[in-house]
């Protein structure tokens, strides 16, 4: 598609190209549901999940309402694998709320760290490790694994240069 856009006879329409952009699903959802709230879209390669988690957390605190955090990416075409390989499709959604309810599974304490932090990773099963290494959008599986096992855990997600996002997870019983 990227090559086709540059060809003189334009074998791809601007609409087809527009629909391939990472924020078009959010835009179409907002139009269809007549939603007027914020709908940030981020593209930060391996740092997309920690960046989205920080952005969603800021929105929860700023607007005092729940946020649907969706991270996804699709398998990248072979020519892009040298630059940024995505081995399979993955999408994960989390609902972040400003206060606890009877449906709350865990309390998250999310902090920005202005320096890289020693990874305090939990033992993950080989299939989870493979998923996480094959698509950066699978990074929340670490957190979801802790929530599912109802364990209190602390983990770090590498963010931009010399920074990380710290997540402390405490289950709600």
Question: Which stretches of residues belong to each language-model region?
Answer:
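Conserved "HGTGT" condensation-loop signature of ketosynthase/thiolase-family condensing enzymes
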Residues: 2-16, 22, 27-38, 72-173
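Conserved donor sugar-nucleotide recognition element shared by glycan-biosynthetic enzymes
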Residues: 21-22, 49
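Conserved active-site beta-strand-loop modules that form the wall/rim of enzyme catalytic pockets
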Residues: 65-68, 93
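Acidic, glycine-rich active-site loops and adjacent beta-strand->loop/helix elements
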Residues: 44-49, 71-77
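Active-site-proximal alpha-helical scaffold in enzymes
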Residues: 43-66
């Amino acid at each position: 598609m990227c090559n086709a856009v540059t060809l003189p006879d334009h074998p791809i329409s601007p609409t087809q190209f527009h629909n391939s952009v990472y924020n078009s699903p959010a835009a179409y959802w907002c139009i269809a549901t007549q939603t007027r709230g914020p709908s940030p879209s981020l593209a930060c390669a391996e740092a997309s999940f920690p960046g989205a988690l920080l952005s969603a957390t800021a929105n929860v605190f700023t607007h005092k309402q729940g946020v649907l955090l969706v991270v996804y990416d699709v398998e990248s075409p072979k020519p892009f694998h040298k630059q940024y390989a995505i081995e399979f499709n993955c999408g994960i959604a989390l609902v972040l709320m400003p206060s606890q309810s009877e449906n709350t599974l865990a309390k998250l304490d999310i902090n920005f760290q202005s320096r890289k932090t020693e990874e305090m990773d939990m033992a993950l099963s080989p299939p989870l490790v493979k998923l996480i290494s094959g698509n950066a959008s699978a990074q929340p599986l670490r957190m979801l694994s802790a929530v599912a096992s109802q364990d209190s855990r602390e983990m770090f997600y590498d963010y931009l240069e010399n920074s990380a996002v710290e997540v402390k997870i405490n289950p709600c019983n």
